Design a protein with these regions (language model features):
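A contiguous, mid-domain pocket- or channel-lining segment that forms the substrate-recognition surface
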Residues: 165
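N-terminal regions that are enriched for targeting/export leaders
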Residues: 2-21, 29
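A short secondary-structure junction signal
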Residues: 154-160
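Active-site nucleotide-donor binding segment shared across nucleotidyl transfer reactions
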Residues: 42-75, 79, 84-85, 250, ...
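Short, functional N-terminal and low-complexity linear motifs
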Residues: 6-12, 53-58, 239-245
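Conserved catalytic core of two-metal-ion nucleotidyltransferases
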Residues: 14, 22-46, 91-152, 171-280, ...
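Conserved SAM-binding loop
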Residues: 87-89
Length: 311
């Protein structure tokens, strides 16, 4: 287990049963890295007067379990666009190794659509991408989502979400022909053919369908209503139009402090309305319904071990 800045008592790492679910020692170690990331994130936000709150399952965990949902393995936070932009401006000087603030501006090719704070001494690689050995930072992370202002016109919001989803699909498609995301096939003949095609694609990808420029269009579309203080807000970075993701601004503007494992974190004052909208019957739960098992985690080794290893 790597050293963490956050002091965590050894007893935390013991296997235990919560709400009928067995939490392994390995899961506890993953939680510890994520809690350390969250603690560092909160420190930076506090120093710079940046507002944020827990998001989604992290709100639910705080309210229902006073910490992580026993079968969950990630932490999400959110902030209004103005605070998100402020964070992006100061992040590179505030977060130092092993903490890495990742956006497309700080780490080309990552293309997540939102920010992530990662621990560079660990590994958190999507299984779907593990064999590709992408060079961007793939340490264990917490997600940081911007919350956008929404038009009062529902049809306009639907159209905006469709444009966001299209741009997201487009930049990911053409990113596969950039140096950051190019994947060389193992078969020598296929590798040769793909390399030729890659070279032929370069003028097109560089000057016509440049994924980095498309990504900027995507970000611009996210912030279409940036300068208008609207009554409705949403997490648009996922590119899906869902009523459950549309919330009232008044529910998010103020926060309250609540226990979360060994930390105290802010959640929206109107958390009940947000949870009702997002989850429905959130006070009831089904064991094992929210884990993100599609990610390969290693709390002992940096992602460099895996992206540099030979086949």
């Amino acid at each position: 287990m790597i050293d963490l800045k956050l002091h965590i008592d050894e007893s935390f790492y013991k296997e235990e049963i919560r709400d009928g679910y067995t939490i392994s020692s390995e899961m506890k170690k993953l939680w510890a890295v994520e809690l350390d990331l969250l603690n560092e994130f909160m420190s930076v936000c506090k120093r710079n007067n940046i507002r944020f709150s827990a998001d989604a399952g992290t709100i639910l965990g705080a309210v229902r379990h006073k910490g992580m949902i026993p079968w969950d393995d990630d932490i999400d936070v959110m902030m209004l666009r103005e605070d998100y932009d402020k964070l992006c401006k100061i992040a590179s000087k505030e977060f130092t190794y092993p903490y890495f603030f990742q956006t497309e501006d700080t780490d080309k090719g990552s293309l997540r659509g939102h920010a992530q704070l990662r621990n560079s001494a660990t590994t958190g690689i999507l299984y779907a991408e593990k064999e590709y050995k992408y060079k961007f930072n793939q340490g264990i992370f917490i997600d940081i989502f911007p919350i956008e202002n929404l038009s009062e016109d529902t049809k306009e919001v639907e159209q905006q979400c469709n444009r966001i989803a299209l741009l997201r699909k487009k930049y990911l498609k053409y990113a596969n022909w950039t140096e950051e995301r190019y994947v060389r096939p193992h078969n020598k003949l296929k590798a040769f053919i793909k390399k030729i095609y890659y070279l032929l694609m370069q003028p097109y990808v560089r000057y016509i369908e440049n994924p980095h420029k498309i990504y900027k269009e995507y970000e611009k579309e996210l912030t279409r209503c940036k300068d208008t203080k609207t009554s409705k807000i949403s997490k648009l970075a996922l590119g899906k139009y869902e009523n459950r993701r549309i919330w009232n601004r008044k529910d998010l503007e103020e926060t309250i402090e609540v226990p979360f494992e060994m930390l105290t974190i802010p959640i929206p004052k109107g958390y009940k309305n947000i949870l009702d909208t997002f989850y429905g019957s959130w006070q009831e739960f089904k064991i094992g319904t929210s884990t993100h098992g599609e990610i390969f985690f290693d709390v002992n080794n940096s992602y460099h071990k895996y992206i540099n290893e030979k086949e």
